[in-house]
């Protein structure tokens, strides 16, 4: 009985670890899809940061500016998941974004069940 319980607990831990890794992956992809493309023009990133392409008061772009930090974060995601990110920019990008969003929700659901037991 103890061995069976140990194996189940070990298996559950493996499922938890793998689900956590998948959740992180799909979170990154969904997050990056909600930002301008990495190669988007500066105007798109300005609009993302300020809500307009021609802000009246532009914050100084420094090493810690929102635009620069977001672009660096997207670049890391591009490097980590190049094929998945390319799918988001492709002809079927909306499909892939929807898939990634659904996968993120599913892995969050699995993790919630494991953590709460419900």
Residue ranges and their predicted role:
Residues 91-118:
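Amphipathic alpha-helical binding modules
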């Amino acid at each position: 009985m103890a061995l069976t319980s140990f194996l189940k607990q070990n298996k559950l831990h493996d499922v938890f670890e793998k689900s956590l890794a998948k959740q992180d992956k799909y979170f990154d992809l969904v997050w990056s899809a909600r930002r301008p493309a990495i190669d988007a023009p500066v105007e798109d990133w300005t609009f993302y940061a300020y809500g307009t392409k021609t802000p009246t008061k532009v914050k100084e772009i420094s090493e810690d500016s929102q635009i620069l930090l977001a672009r660096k974060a997207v670049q890391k995601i591009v490097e980590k998941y190049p094929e998945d990110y390319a799918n988001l920019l492709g002809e079927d990008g909306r499909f892939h974004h929807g898939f990634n969003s659904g996968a993120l929700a599913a892995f969050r659901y699995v993790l919630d069940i494991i953590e709460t037991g419900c």
